[in-house]
């Protein structure tokens, strides 16, 4: 409980500072998705120099990660698709996820959903290697 009290929100990052740093090269937000190793994550390296620990994201997921964006679980080193994080987005109202999908035409939205389900099923089956 004492450790939880010492945690602060991780630094903002990404376009319009609408995301939060999850690690030195990971920036995620509900409306943004996740950036890994891009210019949007450069600011996140500064977290290593701050004296107090931080925590970003929602519910715990995966191996030491937290829900970072709808359907995505990130630790400080990596991100993966996580169906439980889709459920969390729905519990919060799901507005950002739905808003992002409505901007796509029907075929692009269907393709994205099929790709997310394929990746989630492959992960549950312990599949290794590329998705496609």
From Swiss-Prot:
Subcellular location: Secreted
UniProt keyword terms in alphabetical order: Cleavage on pair of basic residues, Disulfide bond, Secreted
Record-level GO cellular component terms: extracellular space; secretory granule
GO molecular function: neurohypophyseal hormone activity
UniProt-listed SUPFAM superfamilies: Neurophysin II
Keyword Flavoprotein attributed: no
Main location per the UniProt record: secreted
SMART domains: NH
Pfam families: Hormone_5
Disulphide connectivity of cysteines: 10-54, 13-27, 21-44, 28-34, 61-73, 67-85, 74-79
Function comment: Neurophysin 2 specifically binds vasopressin.
Family classification: Belongs to the vasopressin/oxytocin family.
Protein name: Neurophysin 2
